[in-house]
Amino acid sequence: MLTIKDVHALEVMDSRGNPTIQASVILSDNTKASAIVPSGASTGKREALELRDNDKTRFLGKGVLRACENVNSVIKHHLIGLEATSQAFVDERLRALDGTPNYANLGANAVLGVSMALARASAKALNLPLYRYLGGANALTLPVPMLNIINGGTHANNSIDFQEYMIMPLGFESFREALRASAEVYHTLKKLLDGKNQLTSVGDEGGFAPNFNNNVEPLEAISQAIEKAGYKLGEEIALALDVASSELVDGNFNYHLKGENKILDSHELVAYYKELVAKYPIVSIEDGLSEDDWEGWAFLSKELGRQIQLVGDDLFVTNASILQKGIEKNVANAILIKPNQIGTISETLETIRLAKHHAYQCVMSHRSGESEDSFIADFAVALNTGEIKTGSTARSERIAKYNRLLEIEHELKGGIYIGKELFKHG
């Protein structure tokens, strides 16, 4: 029987130059594996707690030495000797050890790092790819990437309100071809922006951060780039938005669109989305309304839920009980999956199973503060999520996930790129 021999953590850096945790697990056969925990910029207030030191003399208060110490002392002491391949049991032990609903004691960053490292070590010890260990024989589907090629909101210092403008390469036979087309669109967009004397500096997730005058201009620019790159807009490559509207809302559920110089209520914002969807081939909108605007979400879902994908990120925070509330209220039809919002691999799996049972689409997702760790690429294939959000075709912490998916597609040989089939349900 494989057991846990040692657990330890180290403070390392993420892609924004902020500290994060690298957790390592060593098994009884001396197999060792590590995992680096990501961190978000726009975070839902119901997310599990990311434990920071708040010591202003180190990293402006963002150090994670306390979380590392929790791994190196408390967590280590309680996990040594446990069966390594009993992921659910170990994750439950971590949850009980913390004793709070949101990991306020140990820190979700401490707990998730250990949970990820354990899964990776167990897969390695059994000589299995991580996607096969987590997903079994049914792990066969390569996800459609949602590539963030123009950044706004909290991910960039510009005048665009919406946080992410994405492309989805649906009309291709393989992940490799879909990624190639996306990269070509990205480079074509750069040339177009250069030609308009727009900034081509990039945001946290590798997308460009130009100073457009309003929120529609990025849609025009991306549409142009797709067609100029030689692809059919809407058929081969569609558009998607992450509005991150919890960053735009005030206490009265009015949404401040500075790029448009408008203040809209929920119904007016939904009407605005309907105009955009009618004019552009937008197939997905994430966080179209605030995480607390349940009434607005119900209206959005009624108005657009049969037409496009409506993704809850801040709304659901990868939490099964909150998702259940959304299901009961007929809110949204898809959920963003971010393991660090909930705390462990097993809790993430629970949320995905609930979503799939109720025909909600699942989108595996990175965070804006990332690393070279490619865990979510394997996780997306393991759970056949069908979609993955992991940034643009720039910045090595984003490319690490895409390169891992290329490896997986090559290994699977008979793997399926879901492509056009993604939105053919209901």
UniProtKB/Swiss-Prot annotation:
Cofactor: record remark: Binds a second Mg(2+) ion via substrate during catalysis.
Family, as annotated: Belongs to the enolase family.
EC number in record: 4.2.1.11
GO molecular function: magnesium ion binding; phosphopyruvate hydratase activity
Gene encoding the protein: eno
Cofactor entry: Mg(2+)
Protein residues bound to (2R)-2-phosphoglycerate: Q163, K338, R367, S368, K389
Residues annotated for Mg(2+) binding in this entry: D242, E286, D313
UniProt cross-references to InterPro entries, sorted A to Z: Enolase (IPR000941), Enolase-like_C_sf (IPR036849), Enolase-like_N (IPR029017), Enolase_C (IPR020810), Enolase_CS (IPR020809), Enolase_N (IPR020811)
Tagged with keyword Cytoplasm: yes
Protein name stated in the entry: Enolase
NCBIfam families membership: eno
Role according to the record: Catalyzes the reversible conversion of 2-phosphoglycerate (2-PG) into phosphoenolpyruvate (PEP). It is essential for the degradation of carbohydrates via glycolysis.
Pathway the protein takes part in: Carbohydrate degradation; glycolysis; pyruvate from D-glyceraldehyde 3-phosphate: step 4/5
Species, as recorded: Helicobacter pylori (strain P12)
